A protein has these predicted regions:
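Core AdoMet radical
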Residues: 1-64, 74-78, 115-122
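Acidic, Ser/Thr-rich peripheral helices and adjacent loops at domain boundaries
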Residues: 131-135
Length: 135
């Protein structure tokens, strides 16, 4: 991240997205650049437990994103991939409520407005590729 940030600092016309599932706060010690967007991939905890083993919790990712927002960094929230599971609606509503609570706890009542944007995406692996993975 440090090297990408340094590169972006030298190329102001470049817009760089750093996509992450991290909860480490060291990146907030880097210079705050308007052309470097820190994009946090968020999933309901149930999905993290099932499909994203050994990655930080939803809570830890949201706390990290909130800290970046509070320090003025460009932050994007990515709900990608959204997976259709029987309880998807409840799971994602709980995740959105958790974001509201964490933003509120950190005095980021305007947190949603401070975000660069929010992206939503679906699972994009082709059926042919999935067949190969299952073999």
């Amino acid at each position: 991240v440090r090297l990408w940030s340094a590169y972006a600092a030298k190329h102001e016309n470049l817009k760089l997205e750093i996509r992450t599932k991290c909860a480490g706060h060291a990146m907030w010690d880097l210079p705050c650049l308007s052309n470097v967007i820190y994009a946090f991939t968020l999933s309901p905890q149930k999905m993290i437990d099932a499909f994203e083993k050994e990655t930080p919790s939803a809570f830890a990712r949201i706390v990290c994103a909130a800290e970046g927002l509070k320090k003025g960094f460009p932050v994007r929230l990515c709900f990608d991939p959204m997976l259709y599971l029987p309880s998807w609606k409840t799971d994602y509503l709980q995740l959105l409520s958790q974001i509201d609570r964490i933003f509120g706890d950190r005095m980021l009542h305007d947190g949603w407005e401070k975000l660069v944007d929010v992206s939503v995406g679906t699972f994009r692996i082709s059926q042919e590729y999935m067949k190969k993975l299952r073999r």
